[in-house]
Structure formats: structure tokens, C-alpha cells
Swiss-Prot record:
This is DNA-directed RNA polymerase subunit beta'. Pfam families: RNA_pol_Rpb1_1, RNA_pol_Rpb1_2. It comes from Lepidium virginicum. It catalyses: RNA(n) + a ribonucleoside 5'-triphosphate = RNA(n+1) + diphosphate. Mg(2+) binds at residues 489, 491, 493.
Amino acid sequence: MIDRYKHQQLRIGLVSPQQISAWATKIIPNGEIVGEVTKPYTFHYKTNKPEKDGLFCERIFGPIKSGICACGNYRVIGDEKEDPKFCEQCGVEFVDSRIRRYQMGYIKLTCPVTHVWYLKRLPSYIANLLDKPLKELEGLVYCDFSFARPITKKPTFLRLRGSFEYEIQSWKYSIPLFFTTQGFDIFRNREISTGAGAIREQLADLDLRIIIENSLVEWKQLGEEGPTGNEWEDRKIVRRKDFLVRRMELAKHFIRTNIEPEWMVLCLLPVLPPELRPIIQIEGGKLMSSDINELYRRVIYRNNTLTDLLTTSRSTPGELVMCQEKLVQEAVDTLLDNGIRGQPMRDGHNKVYKSFSDVIEGKEGRFRETLLGKRVDYSGRSVIVVGPSLSLHRCGLPREIAIELFQTFVIRGLIRQHLASNIGVAKSQIREKKPIVWEILQEVMQGHPVLLNRAPTLHRLGIQSFQPILVEGRTICLHPLVCKGFNADFDGDQMAVHVPLSLEAQAEARLLMFSHMNLLSPAIGDPISVPTQDMLIGLYVLTSGTRRGISANRYNPCNRKNYQNERIYETHYKYTKEPFFCNSYDAIGAYRQKRINLDSPLWLRWQLDQRVIASREVPIEVHYESFGNYHEIYAHYLIVRSVKKETFCIYIRTTVGHISFYREIEEAIQGFSQACSYDT
């Protein structure tokens, strides 16, 4: 059993037959070695107890009830007395029944069987390593080829003259005679290479380092040749080069992980613990069983039949043996991955069997449902909405979610401040939603970050930490700048919120996972906190006021909204006098008092460098005053000059939206400059 405190990661890969045997076999106190499942039975129909050496055997997988053997005897678990720790009659150990969740068994296959994941899935790892067409290998595995080229190094009978009684006849009539003789096994083991055993022998003879060297040499030669001018030949060269790259990467992976290629062919088939493939009794005495049990039974039936053909019957035709080996291969394929690149196997009710691959893969599989994405305490879920007023490292948490997530902390705070005498009184105060509850909740949230996660979590920025604040409503408020890391938008997306409990988790959330600590992409280093989607729309609306200058806006139809109560005809739009402001604070104050709109054009006094103004630009209008002063009005600015042509002041034509946008950028630059000065 894996200790979760000693192991920080889990790797799935190929293992050797010796490792499978070490996982599944155990030595009981009387010295007997158990672990091999030899019978396809589950429970006895009369006693309703597991069959010995069957798929639910208590000797192999442990007792069904803790401390009770198959005979019904009971022993206290962990008793230090000299009583035997197993039943001498049935051979069942007196251990905890939870052992049936992780104790494995194995099936000793009579013939080698290729692992269907490495043969039929694309790209085929076996075909890549052997550099042979997949169809040819499939025909060899499923015994569609009567014989293959001998791979033994010894001299073969097929190469010697006079080996056949009917030497005059052709090979077409001579070879089938060997498939019906009593010495077929000897002949086949020496002369014919077929089935998964042939694949295993070829994989065992591979030298991975030589494969890497030869593939690299061939890849360089193909690269030096250059284009041939024939499109078909050029495509073949490109495909061959891609294949060589995949082959080298695969060989390097096998070397790096200390995996032998022949392990892709199975000699021992692991049997899952019985608690992971249960049989449940429902109302009416009916039994519900996992499909994997039926698939295991099919494998054992066919494997035992093949064993009988090879051991008990000396005169079994060779074609029958090869056919039975093919059935064993197909049964194991169905167990591991039913219907892979073919018609799936169905039961009597025309229902597709759920294989091992179906159990572990997908959203409802073992990994994503119960290991990676299982439901946990101190977590919640809700729809996200935009929170533009939030800081980058903050998120808005609804009161309903926050009080549930931090309820234990609030209860502790109420008791510590002597506002509640016990847990029951504290819970009643929380249910009544007293004001003191929200005050304590805010105190708790100030020192406790939360984790936000949006599925699917494809990279590390899919889960980040934030400082929560209470908001009204039932939705989670999120700053729009962090959307790109989550790949989120505000069209109904949901996010999960988690509370880190341990000090290590809280420290990691604060130092590594805060959103303002993850401004760059960890993959390529580009900025990840960039305006996207709703923020871009907001910036567009904020700055879309004076794009066409004074000439186009003098009689702009957009000005009609300032005169909504007056009747305005399409041919004569009423002109709105544009107000003048001395500073940005007055302009924003007028907007807040609703005297002007967000995109209403206005004149703002500005300290503008004279060099920015083009000397050749001609004013659109010139307004003269009685004292001789005059205003030169350009497309986007206005200059007030004296009689002596001295510049008094300059006004720029802008909107409240532009002013707000400029102030935000200015504050951000100043804050960044201050932070840099502190660091230096």
C-alpha cells in the first residue's frame, strides 16, 4: 500500500513480470506462496462465500470481514499472543479487511500476450521500435500468418533438403502437414515464430542505443539530400524523418526510465483488488457485478483451455492451438481496452462491457473523479463575474460561500472572544446572521488567502491564490486581468474556491500562488496579465469619444443625448457648447454630478510641450475677444494667445473616459517606479 506521507508523486508505466509477481504474491505463515488466480469463479452459489483460488479468494486477497477467516473463526487483530495469525484449515490470515482494497493477484498466461495499448494505439510504440508496419505486426500477433521468418540462430529444418517425406510436392502442400503432427510444438518452437512470443523475442533482441545511433545517422542523411522535386517523394522523406524522431525519443525514454521493451508483452496479467471490482447484492437477492469480473473470467477460461490443449492432449492440431492463443490475446485486449479500433464486445443484453481503460479514463474515470477531481471539504463553487474595482490580488467572495468556508474559524473566534459559550451557541448565532458574525468573518478573511481554480487545470496558472473580500450577491468577483491565466471569461464560467488549511499550504499560497506573483507565463515568459475580452471592451467604451476631432463632432448626432427632452430634427442637430475645465478633478466631479457624460467632449487645461504642436498646422477656427486676445482652435487642442501672440494656456479636447484612463496609467507607472527605487 502506498504511504501518502512518504510518496509525493505517482508515475504510471511498464513494469517487469518480476515486479508484478512481487506485488501479487505473498507467503502465508505456513510457508505457502499464494497469489495466482487459477479459477474463473467468484462466489459459491450455495454458501455465498468466495471460491478458493478464484477472483475473490480470501487466501489471496484477504478476509471479507476483519479478523474472520473463511471458516468463521475469529481472532483479534494485532493480538500479541502466540495464537497463529492465520487459519490452518482455510489458510486465511487474520488481518484487516481493508487489505482487499490494495492486495493484488495475478494470472499466469500460458502464452505471451501483447499489451493492446502499446500495439494498437496510435502511434504504436511496438511498431515504432521494430520499424515494421502495424498491419504486419497485428497479423503476427493474432496468428494470421501461418509462419514467419525464423528468428532463431540455430540451423532450421526448413533449410535442409530431405526433411519432408513428400519432397516432390510444393511447400504449399508440405507445410500444412507439420500443423497436424504430434511434434508440432517442437517444430514450432524451433522453426516458426508467430504470436506475441515472436514480438517478445524481437523486442528482447533490440539494442536501444544502436537504434538511436542508426536513426540519427539516417535522419542526417535524409536532411542532407534536400528536396527531390517530386512532391510525393518529398512527403515520404518528411514522414520518414518525423518517424525517426519519434523512434529516437521513444528509445531515449525507455533508457531514461530503465524500462525494457519486452515488457510491452505480458506473461503475467495483474488482477485488480476485489474491492475495486465489487459484486453487490441488491433488493430481491439479485447481484450486480463489475464488468471487469466477467472479462477476467473470460481470460481465465480461455487461458485454462489453452493449458489443457498443450498439456493433456498430445495430438492437438497446431491450428487449434494457434486459434486458442488468438482467443486468449483477444480476451486480454477486451479486458484492457474494449473496442479499441474495432467492434466492442457486448453482453447478453447488447450492452458494451466496461473495460479497464473505460474505468480509469475520462471525466468519470478513477483518476479525474476520485483522485484528481474528487469533492473535498472547505471548498465551494459559483459563477464568476467581473470585478473591475478589485485589486489584482483580491477576489470578491459571496457572504453565503464565505460563512460556510470559514465557519470553523468564525466559531473559534466567537468562543475566544467570549461571545459564545460553546459550539452550538456559535452555530445558532451564525444561522441568525448577527452583525458580530460578519465582523469576525472579515477579521478571519484578512489573514487567510483562498485558492481559485477553473477546470480544466491545464497548467499551473489554472489555480491561483487571492485575498478574499466580502461582496453581495451569489457570484465570485474576479479581476479581469487574471482571466488569461485561467482561460476564463464572464459568459457563465464557474470557478471553485478552496481554503488552504495547513501552514505550509498558506505559505505556498502567499509566496508562490498569489496572482500578482504570476504576471509572466512560466512556459514562454510572455506577460500573462494582459487586457482581454471584457476589459478591452471597457477600454474601448472609455476612450471612444473624440476620435474624429472637432470638425466631425461640431454637429455630431451623438450630442443629441444631452438634449433628450428636446425635439431635434435630423437635418438640424443642436450644437452643444463644450465646457472648459482647469484640471482633471473638476472634470471628473462634473461627471459624478451627472452634468456631463462619460464620452462628452470637453476642453481641459494642459501643460503641453510646444514642440508637440506641428508648426505647419492651420487652425480650424479663430475666436477673438474684445481685449484683443484670441483662441486658435485646432482639431484636438486649443491655444489662447495674447495680442502680442504670447501663449497664455493650452486646452486639449478630450473626454472624462480619456482622463480616467490616463490617470490609471500614470498611477501605475508611478507605483512601478517607486517599487524599482525601493529595490535598488
